Amino acid sequence: MSGNTLGTLFTVTTFGESHGPAIGCVIDGCPPGMGLTEADIQIELDRRKPGTSRHVTQRQEADEVEILSGVFEGVTTGTPIALLIRNTDQRSKDYGNIVETFRPGHADYTYWQKYGIRDYRGGGRSSARLTAPIVGAGAVAKKWLRERFGVEVRGYMSGLGEIDVPFVDWSHVHENPFFSPNAAVVPELEAYMDALRKDGDSIGARIDVVASGVPVGWGEPVFDRLDADIAKAMMSINAVKGVEIGAGFESVAQRGSVHGDELTPGGFVGNHAGGVLGGISTGQDITVSIAIKPTSSIRTPRRSITKAGDEATVETFGRHDPCVGIRATPIAESMLALVLIDHALRHRAQCGDVETPTPKIAGSAT
């Protein structure tokens, strides 16, 4: 398995399995001299960790992070930063019924056919448990981006199943387990999830992420375009089946006179491009949306096959999120931050001294 590293100059390599002794990552390329403690990382991990409400998996993991290297006297040294998160609440017996069968919608069948071996315990390497190290690395990236450029990366749930969640205010996001930016919708979301759990079924969600303060110029055309790398990173998150940047698929129905964001001396008029043109950041907010599929592990019996190819019926028993999207907001934020810090460093390496006579216009005309 060779696809475990994200990034070019700021790289993150994750390791571990859902029911192994620990999971973690190694960050390479973090600039030296930034203050960093385990508390800086833990605050982000606590936003993602399981067992925080009745609407998510009841697996109880503290997700306490340990910094093993790359930090001396509370400051990054420029050497690899190793983060470790120990697994403490594995319950592998819940997966005894799928040793010889494949769960529909999961990576069981594809991992088996590709590698000839699979860790059936909680999905092993393919588990969403492995998003915890991504959030840990994302905390490092967020801190550097915020301190160096004033970049803020924030996200929220904009839809759960058939329920749209209109944006009201960022202050609402941190006050409910759904990361909903609209407190008035939370009771409806709770009732929906309670009914879903009673039915033994699952549902998908939409997450929106916004990066504010990104300067013009980040991105490496043509094959390492900023939006291309964002899309790849987002599609690397478990259960993500779609990515939109800016207007996304709504662009199909828009005329050029509407979609093209006009430039004025006072700033851009509109942001249908989502803050990226030609694969390079415009200086506007970078806006990304992801579609997360329904959780494949459900109590409803589903048809499948055994390793021998015979018919089988699979009913999943473990502790699972009826909607993985509920905990996906900090994961999506982290992925965006990791792409941005990598491109910030790449831009600085090649074009950091470039100056033009053209003023940098505001992201939005007032």
From Swiss-Prot:
Q: What is the lineage of its organism?
A: Bacteria, Pseudomonadati, Pseudomonadota, Betaproteobacteria, Burkholderiales
Coiled-coil annotated spans: none
Gene Ontology MF terms = chorismate synthase activity; FMN binding
> Which residues make up the binding site for NADP(+)?
R48, R54
UniProt keyword NADP, yes or no: yes
Q: Which gene is annotated as encoding this protein in its UniProt record? A: aroC
Record function comment? This reaction introduces a second double bond into the aromatic ring system.
Question: Per UniProt, which keywords does this protein have?
Answer: Amino-acid biosynthesis, Aromatic amino acid biosynthesis, FAD, Flavoprotein, FMN, Lyase, NADP
Q: Which SUPFAM superfamilies match?
A: Chorismate synthase, AroC
Q: How does it assemble?
A: Homotetramer.
Q: What is this protein called?
A: Chorismate synthase
Q: What processes in GO biological process is this protein linked to?
A: amino acid biosynthetic process; aromatic amino acid family biosynthetic process; chorismate biosynthetic process
User: EC number(s) per UniProt?
Assistant: 4.2.3.5
Give the cofactor note. Answer: Reduced FMN (FMNH(2)).
**Cofactor list:** FMNH2
Family per similarity comment:
Belongs to the chorismate synthase family.
Catalysed reaction(s) here are: 5-O-(1-carboxyvinyl)-3-phosphoshikimate = chorismate + phosphate
Its source organism is: Burkholderia lata (strain ATCC 17760 / DSM 23089 / LMG 22485 / NCIMB 9086 / R18194 / 383)
- Write down the InterPro entries for this protein, in alphabetical order: Chorismate_synth, Chorismate_synth_AroC_sf, Chorismate_synthase_CS
Q: Which residues bind FMN?
A: R125, S126, S127, N238, A239, G278, K293, P294, T295, S296, S297, R319
Pathway(s) of this molecule: Metabolic intermediate biosynthesis; chorismate biosynthesis; chorismate from D-erythrose 4-phosphate and phosphoenolpyruvate: step 7/7
Any one Pfam family here would be Chorismate_synt
Q: Which GO terms describe its cellular component?
A: cytosol
